[in-house]
From Swiss-Prot:
UniProt-annotated stretches for the region Disordered: 43-67, 286-307
Residue stretches making up the CP-type G domain: 203-504
Disulfide bonds: none
Family matches, as Gene3D superfamilies: P-loop containing nucleotide triphosphate hydrolases
Protein name per the record: Nitric oxide-associated protein 1
Gene deletion effect: Mice display mid-gestation lethality associated with a severe developmental defect of the embryo and trophoblast. Primary embryonic fibroblasts isolated from mutant 9.5 dpc embryos show deficient mitochondrial synthesis and a global defect of oxidative phosphorylation.
Length: 693
């Protein structure tokens, strides 16, 4: 494209035609009459000066000593009128537009040629442009949730839009590592789609997997925040005559209320297992009761003949997120279960099964190649993320592998935090922010692609005639995705992640995805303590309420729930008006959406509670509001407390012995002119690291 000034000059010259000759006087007249051509570049330099000897004026020209000095004058260019300037600019714009249109057409033709080449190389797939039940499923399962991929109906698990389904089928290797629309939205946008999957379908899928022939071990994962309702009442019927290990997950979220709190949590989990009708394995001591602490009456009076044949081999506390207790669990599985059969991970929704699946996938419990070939499961606080079975091959714990693993664990235990790399220290600091206790999960053996892709090439003739030559080993760098071959999985045993079983009367069934992210704790819980006297009310968001109706003295109420769920204290006579005004708004936060949301949300239902006080600084009971958390009640002195709890209609409110009986001690000083105490967060501890030097 021409510069504006140059283009304007050219147009101006073409429009005017030849310029008029300048008037010449004196001896210079004969130069013009003789058609003397003086170069333009010489005119400016010779203005008012004598013509240099090298100039070529005419063939007759001869300079003598008496020759008079000659002058040349520039041509006269008349000024342009405004109309001419406007016309020139308009012509210039038209020229520019013409050039832009030609450039645009050239680029468009180039793009069309490229698209034709791409379409020529694609395979066609008979998939309609809209969901259609006549299109058969792909036969390939989502690597995030395990559902079969299809484009039949958006409300069914494994759905992919038509374009994504076609692109996945046309990709190299097919849709083997593709995730469904639901997993994609969960991971990349934090959105969850409600699917048409009932609780009976979940139970049937899990029970069908557990009925498979052959020996199998069941790992039943419970959320410690759901105690004592973490165990399903029909668990023995679901598991059947199989060996069982109970894993108490999310222990990293609970603060230490007193020394020995982990032992008390483990004993509490043992009691719940026995109360659910499970049998302790022969030779196992079961729950250990400290001196003066006896088992519950319903456990002592339980008829052994009425119990099921489901045997509990062990109870362990772990954190699938921070890694606490995971290495010890792997060692126990390799010692006791070894390689006798498949292992199934079972539990309710939001217990953390997919997180443990991903942690074990990168540990010594999975084969080295399987860790590289299998995608991680989709993790989300939304209940029911996993919709089908996910699996990875279990590593056979041979004596050599167990020896190398044990030596690695011993070396890791001798390291201090300062000895770790910057990347490991950064990851460890992030885990400390998420939980109170942290454990490091490592890997002893790693897989390299060259183990399977190093061909042994040689020339037979050269070996026959030249004994000094060596075979040539060439390493072929491949960019293909690592995949398990039939030889890799021959006679292999698998670790299965099963879909979570939905709980009835759970408050999560009433909440939206944004509300669930607020209610479910994902970081270490900081207890919040308030001192209330009779006639006061505690609101836990807009989903729970406790009225202190009557009591001899004040009492401490310690909230153990998500740090993002607000707590509001008011008087009994103002409580109803406050809830009517602020429910669905910022003060109570959950539910969200104002009057329209509250019109769909069920009303709060009241239930009277009577508690008898015990020792000072020890809670007498926990008031649990489904999966939203609990409030530990600690009276000042012995006496009777009359309370009233409120929960949404259709959800469960339970009163049970305190999980953390000394939680009231985890508080700061009382705020001035307030019923609240300053919060205090206990320090985080790393389990398998050497102490600071």
């Amino acid at each position: 494209m021409l510069p504006a000034r140059l283009a304007c000059g050219l147009l101006c010259g073409l429009r005017r035609g030849p310029a008029p000759a300048a008037a010449c006087y004196g001896p210079a007249r004969w130069l013009l009459e003789g058609k003397c051509e003086v170069p333009i570049r010489q005119r400016a330099s010779s203005l008012g000066r004598r013509v240099p000897p090298s100039s070529t004026a005419t063939e007759d020209y001869a300079e003598g000593p008496d020759t008079e000095e000659r002058f040349l004058f520039p041509e006269y260019v008349p000024e342009r009128t405004p109309e001419e300037q406007v016309r020139e600019l308009q012509e210039l714009r038209e020229l520019q537009q013409l050039q832009q249109e030609k450039e645009r057409e050239r680029l468009q033709q180039r793009e069309e040629r490229l698209q034709q080449k791409l379409r020529a190389g694609f395979r066609t797939l008979p998939v309609p442009e809209f969901p259609d039940a006549s299109v058969p499923p792909s036969g390939i399962y989502c690597s995030g949730c395990g559902a079969e991929l299809h484009c039949q109906h958006p409300g069914l698990p494994g759905y992919l839009p038509e374009e994504k389904f076609r692109d996945a089928a046309q990709a190299e290797g097919g849709p083997a590592r593709t995730v469904c629309q639901r997993c994609w939205l969960l991971v990349h946008h934090g959105r969850a789609l409600r699917l048409q999957v009932s609780r009976d379908q979940y139970l049937e899928l899990v029970s069908a997997a557990l009925r498979r022939p052959g020996p199998a071990l069941v790992l039943y994962m419970v959320n410690l925040l759901d105690l004592p309702d973490a165990l399903l009442p029909d668990l023995p019927k679901l598991v059947g005559p199989k060996q069982l290990i109970v894993l108490g997950n999310k222990v990293d979220l609970l603060p230490q209320d007193a020394p020995g709190y982990l032992k008390r949590l483990r004993k509490r989990l043992w009691d719940d297992c026995i109360r659910a009708g499970l049998v302790v394995a022969p030779g196992h001591q079961g729950p250990q009761y400290p001196a003066g602490d006896e088992p519950l009456e319903e456990i002592k009076n339980q008829n052994p003949s009425s119990r099921s044949r489901t045997v509990v081999k062990d109870v362990r506390l772990i954190s699938a997120k921070t890694g606490y207790g995971v290495e010890e669990m792997i060692s126990a599985l390799q010692r006791s279960w070894r390689y006798r059969g498949d292992v199934y991970l079972v539990g309710t929704t939001n217990a953390g099964k997919s997180t443990l699946f991903n942690t074990l996938l990168e540990s010594d419990y999975c084969t080295a190649k399987g860790s590289e070939a299998i995608d991680r499961a989709t993790i989300s606080p939304w209940p029911g993320t996993t919709l089908n079975l996910l699996k990875f091959p279990i590593c056979n714990p041979t004596p050599y592998r167990m020896f190398k693993r044990q030596r690695r664990l011993q070396e890791d235990a001798t390291k201090a935090e300062e000895d770790l790399s910057e990347e490991e220290q950064s990851q460890l600091n992030q885990l400390k922010k998420h939980g109170y206790i942290v454990g490091r999960v490592g890997r002893t053996f790693s897989y390299s692609r060259e183990q399977d892709e190093v061909p042994f090439e040689f020339d037979a003739d050269s070996l026959a005639f030249d004994m000094g030559s060596e075979p040539v080993v060439s390493v072929c760098k491949s960019t293909k995705q690592i995949e398990l071959t039939p030889e890799d999985v021959k006679d292999a045993h698998w670790f299965y992640d099963t879909p979570g079983i939905t709980k009835e009367s759970c408050i999560l069934n009433l909440l939206t995805e944004k509300e669930i992210n607020t209610v479910l704790p994902t970081h270490s819980i900081i207890p919040r303590t308030f001192v209330l006297k009779p006639g006061m009310v505690l609101f836990l968001g807009g989903i729970a309420r406790i009225d202190f109706l009557q009591g001899n003295q004040s009492a401490w109420f310690t909230v153990v729930a998500s740090n993002f769920l607000p707590v509001h204290i008011t008087s009994l006579d103002k409580a109803d008006a406050l809830y009517e005004k602020h429910a669905g708004h910022e003060l109570l936060l959950v539910p969200m959406g104002g009057k329209e949301r509250m019109a769909q949300f069920p009303p709060l239902v009241a239930e009277d509670i009577t508690l008898k006080g015990g020792g000072k600084f020890e809670a007498v009971a926990d008031i649990k509001f489904s999966s939203a958390g609990w409030v530990a009640v600690t009276p000042y002195s012995e006496g009777t407390l009359h309370l009233r709890g409120h929960t949404p209609e259709g959800t469960a409110l339970t009163v049970h012995p305190p999980v953390l009986p000394y939680i009231v001690n985890v508080k700061g000083q009382r705020m001035k002119k307030s019923v609240a105490y300053k919060t205090k967060k206990p320090p985080s501890l790393v389990h398998n690291l050497k102490k600071h030097r």
